[in-house]
Structure formats: C-alpha cells, structure tokens
C-alpha cells in the first residue's frame, strides 16, 4: 500500500509561508533570469495565468491584477523540501523521494491498525503544522493508482479534504470512469491521442483493455501501467535514488558575455558547483567537459557553440582539479567577438568513494589533504550559506550572474535573512 504526498503549488507556497500578507492573493514564481511562469498558486490559476507565460509580456497585466511575482529562490525551496521529507520519514517506515515536492510512503501494515484516510489526514496535518505547507495525499495499492488518488485529492480538495483512499475497488472504478486517459501518470500527449483514436478515452477504458492488445500496439511500459491500474504492483518503492551517471551545471547568463575573463569566472563557478554536487553524491569523476554557446535566436548575429573535454587518469572530487580541467577546456573553444548566452560544465565517468584507484603515471596525483580541505569548505558553505567560501577564479562582482530581480530572502538558511519579530 502506497501513499503519494505532494505539496500543493510548492514553489509559490514556499514564498507565502513567510509572507502572511500574501495569503489569498495571486502569487507566481518565475524561471531562471525571470523568464516565464513556472509555478502559480490557486488564486493565480483562477485569473487564467498559465505555466510558461513570459514575464515581459504579462508584467503589465500582472500589475493590474495584483499578481505578486518572485524570482526562483532555489535555496529556500530545497530547505523547505528537506523539512517536508524529514517529516514524512518520521511518519512512514520507508519513503521514496520522487521529486522536490512529492514522495511515496510505504503504508504496509498500516491498514491493519489504522483507517487509511485518518492516517492520510494525520500526514497532512503534521506536515502543515511543521512547515505551513499543504500536501495532497493519495492512497492506493500501486504507485500509479496512488498518483491517480493524489490527483483527485488536489482536484476536488473541498470535497475530499485533500486525502483520497483508493484501496476500495468500487471507488477506484468510479474515479477512473470520471477521468480522461491523459490524467494517468506517464501517459503523454502522443500516447493519449493514439489511445483516443482507438476508443480508449477514460482511465477506466484503459484499465479494462486487454493486456495482449496493449502489448501488441504499444510497449511494456504501458502494459505495466495498465497492470498497476488493475491493482497489480509493478513499481516497487525505491528508498535510494539510483547513482547519477553525470552531473551538469549550466545557466543562461543574466547579460550576454563578450569578454574572456567574465566567461572564465562563470566556468570556474559552474565547475565549483558541479564538484560540490559530486562530493554530495560520494563520487569521483574522470571526465570534465565545458560548453559555451550564443543564442540561436539572436537576429543578425552568427551562431557559435562548441564544447571540449578533459579525461583525467586518476578520478578526483577536488574542486581545484575540476576547475583546472574545465578552464583548460574553455581555452580550447573560446572565440572572441561573440555574445555568449549560455555555458556549462559536465562531469562524467564516475567512481564510487573508496573504489577509485590511483595511477602511477598521472602527473596530477591527489593533493595532500584534499579530502579534508573539501570537507571543511563544504561544511562552512552548508552552515553559513553557499558562496561563503569560494575560489578567487569565480570572481567577486559577477555581472553575468542569473537575473533574479524579485528574489525573496533565504529565510531558513541565511542568518542575515531571518525574520524579525517586533
């Protein structure tokens, strides 16, 4: 038995938690460089604000309608996500963190001693009490059904109280008959169009379709979905995320970069951030790649994009080695005379901690005290805020940094941003 817990309008809700004056007002969160809408609360949806609406086209309308806009505050969202997930892990013996704002909880054995709907309400109330965030809870025998139940809990929140238990077969079929097939987890527009052309219009139609027909006309993924809709668990709980095969750190610049020193600062910053992520995964890497490119949509400007890479003999997780390799790659592809829009650093060819082997012929042998230095750096930045301790090559005044003109304070991770009670 699974419970899918999903925070309602997560990014927008994180902003209103610390701004009670915004409760009941339309709120949206914008993408990198304040480009377009990536999150909106219920009040913004009611005004017709759509995902992907460009900020520069809608800002006058937003101003007239009283829509409050925020730049993406990823530091705040990550910390609030950790608080939600920690709460869920206290309430359930096993939890799979599916994304920044949703998780599957294992309810095996709970129904023997608790009413599942009551337990879902307890989850919802506890998360609300500790974080002031509202979650929808969908409960069912399979992950796909739990997703469907969660969808219903959020769609009909007033009637359901934000909790839907689909463990009852009759209730399952009633809900499935009311939902279009494209509401099923994992069914995209292309597959839903094909199903519709075959006369499979509702979720119930799909659940009742012969498995052999699905296997013949589609693939094993959709077959698994149909089996899950019938209550047959095919997707197990994954408590530990699979090991990453690569790490990419890239951004579009707030302003176009035209000079080498600024680009080098950006590459140093991305390499340092990628190295930090690498260490958090307890991995070492041998492959470091750098790419730069201009905008393909810029009028009267020639397009240029290129990448270069370095393969180390000995795996590393030291930021200094990774920055050095990334800037060497930049030197191989840099061309003056362009207005660069984006750049990034990618790490690959990973080795687990304790598995990486030294190479006798490598000129770049591990630096003495490397692990201890990186640990001190990561600990300080985690405690005092990212960027407290950084490399000189990253620069001090980073004009190329991502635009976040409407950034809210980092209420939970920066001592200087703590709310003051008067």
UniProtKB/Swiss-Prot annotation:
Signal peptide per UniProt: none
Induction note: Repressed by LexA, induced by DNA damage. Induced 1.5-fold by hydroxyurea.
Domain of life: Bacteria
Limits of the UmuC domain: 2-188
Pfam annotation, one family: IMS_HHH
GO biological process, one term: translesion synthesis
Sorted UniProt keywords: DNA damage, DNA repair, SOS mutagenesis, SOS response
Record-level GO cellular component terms: cytosol; DNA polymerase V complex; membrane; plasma membrane
DNA damage keyword on record: yes
InterPro entries (alphabetical): DNA/RNA_pol_sf (IPR043502), DNA_pol_Y-fam_lit_finger_sf (IPR036775), DNA_pol_Y-fam_little_finger (IPR017961), DNA_polymerase-Y (IPR050116), DUF4113 (IPR025188), PolY_HhH_motif (IPR024728), Rev_trsase/Diguanyl_cyclase (IPR043128), UmuC (IPR001126)
A molecular function GO annotation: single-stranded DNA binding
Entry keyword annotation includes DNA damage: yes
SUPFAM superfamilies: DNA/RNA polymerases, Lesion bypass DNA polymerase (Y-family), little finger domain
Role description: Involved in UV protection and mutation. Poorly processive, error-prone DNA polymerase involved in translesion repair. Essential for induced (or SOS) mutagenesis. Able to replicate DNA across DNA lesions (thymine photodimers and abasic sites, translesion synthesis) in the presence of activated RecA; efficiency is maximal in the presence of the beta sliding-clamp and clamp-loading complex of DNA polymerase III plus single-stranded binding protein (SSB). RecA and to a lesser extent the beta clamp-complex may target Pol V to replication complexes stalled at DNA template lesions.
PANTHER family: DNA REPAIR POLYMERASE UMUC / TRANSFERASE FAMILY MEMBER, PROTEIN UMUC
Protein family membership: Belongs to the DNA polymerase type-Y family.
Name of the protein in question: Protein UmuC
The organism of origin for this protein: Escherichia coli (strain K12)
Gene of this entry: umuC
């Amino acid at each position: 038995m699974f419970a899918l817990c999903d925070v309602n309008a997560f990014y927008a809700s994180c902003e209103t938690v610390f701004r009670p004056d915004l409760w009941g007002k339309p709120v949206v969160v914008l993408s990198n460089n304040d480009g377009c809408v990536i999150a909106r609360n219920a009040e913004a949806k009611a005004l017709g604000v759509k995902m992907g609406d460009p900020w520069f086209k809608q800002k006058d309308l937003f101003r007239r309608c009283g829509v409050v806009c925020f730049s993406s505050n990823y530091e705040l969202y990550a910390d609030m996500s950790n608080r939600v997930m920690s709460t869920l892990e206290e309430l359930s013996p096993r939890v799979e963190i599916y994304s920044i704002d949703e998780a599957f909880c294992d309810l095996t054995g709970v129904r023997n001693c608790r009413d599942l709907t009551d337990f879902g309400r307890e989850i919802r109330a506890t998360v609300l009490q500790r974080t002031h965030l509202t979650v929808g809870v969908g409960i069912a025998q399979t992950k796909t059904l739990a997703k469907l139940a969660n969808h219903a809990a959020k769609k009909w929140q007033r009637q359901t109280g934000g909790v839907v238990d689909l463990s009852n077969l009759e209730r399952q079929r009633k809900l499935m008959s009311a939902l279009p097939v494209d509401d099923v987890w994992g069914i995209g527009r292309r597959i839903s169009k094909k199903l519709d052309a075959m006369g499979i219009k509702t979720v119930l139609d799909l659940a009742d379709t012969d498995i052999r027909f699905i296997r013949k006309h589609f693939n094993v993924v959709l077959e698994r979905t149909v089996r899950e809709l019938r209550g047959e668990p095919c997707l197990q709980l994954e408590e530990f995320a699979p090991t990453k095969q690569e790490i990419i750190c890239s951004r579009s610049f707030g302003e176009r970069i035209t000079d080498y020193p600024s680009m080098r600062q950006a590459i140093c910053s991305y390499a340092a951030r990628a190295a930090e992520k690498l260490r958090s995964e307890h991995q070492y890497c041998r492959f470091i790649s750098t790419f730069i490119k201009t905008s393909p949509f810029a009028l009267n400007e020639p397009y240029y994009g290129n990448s270069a890479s370095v393969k180390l003999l000995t795996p590393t997780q030291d930021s200094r080695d990774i920055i050095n390799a990334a800037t060497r790659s930049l030197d191989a592809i840099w061309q003056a005379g362009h207005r660069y829009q984006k750049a990034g650093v990618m790490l690959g060819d990973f080795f687990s901690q304790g598995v990486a082997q030294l190479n006798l012929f490598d000129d770049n042998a591990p630096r003495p005290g490397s692990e201890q230095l990186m640990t001190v750096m990561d600990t300080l930045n985690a405690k005092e805020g990212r960027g407290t301790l950084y490399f000189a090559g990253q620069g001090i005044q980073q004009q190329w940094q991502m635009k976040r003109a409407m950034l809210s304070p980092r209420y939970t991770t920066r001592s200087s941003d703590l709310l003051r009670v008067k």
